[in-house]
């Protein structure tokens, strides 16, 4: 993962934010924008995890309330050498998952009931390993900063539109041009930067997640099924809060309008191809069939009481022992 590139992109967003502040209030406005950006990121650093979990009405679970799901995450965290994160369930039909938290010691992972119901245990393990990889790579903090700055830039762009820019510094045509730049170009640029940061980190999390769960094909199979599910099962909460879309393993937005054109995630087929190549290099060829052959569970799923097919393969079980066993 290129941390230098990420730092440069975040710096670029900060410059955009300060530039809009300058258009609104000259040098003083620029400094105020900088102070606001710092304050928002400090607030996001300490509170972003609580905010997003509350936004999606996530329910915290433990070994008693969700034994198999909790133990799976515990085993994967041990594989990764991470502290045990808090574990959440989101009551949402669309299969998806995300991680949040400012550092590995204050991390949380969340999966939707749609994910736990529709995917095999192997696939769920691949997904949760991917989310733990984000925690280990500290992507959750980076993306919180990026999302905060992107939201702030859009907010200031709207202010510039309504206020018409700084009257003293932007009269006539230049004032109109400056306002248009603040209203359209800066938020658009912030969105592009946000996507660039998100996409580079997804590939790294896929690779590390495959290492954590031990089988890249579990994750590749899961990505395909989640992507198909996201196209036909809307996530209403995500549609209302599109700034959080980058947090999920697959873009939860429905694809209406410009969602597909400006995706926060790399192309799913490219991610699957990279994982399949990784599996081939590891000499793993048959695990994908085990995962893909598992019928979607319509029972209690691997987070609650053990269902008949919770092991993933009703024909004698999986050849591969996963961390849920």
Swiss-Prot record:
It is a multi-pass membrane protein. Zn(2+) binds at residues 130, 134, 202. The chain crosses the membrane at residues 20-40, 145-165, 173-193. The gene is htpX. Belongs to the peptidase M48B family. Its cofactor is Zn(2+). Binds 1 zinc ion per subunit. Residues 306-325 have a biased composition (Low complexity). This is Protease HtpX homolog. It comes from Brucella abortus (strain 2308). Its main location: membrane. PANTHER family: PROTEASE HTPX. GO terms for molecular function: metalloendopeptidase activity; zinc ion binding. Its EC number is 3.4.24.-.
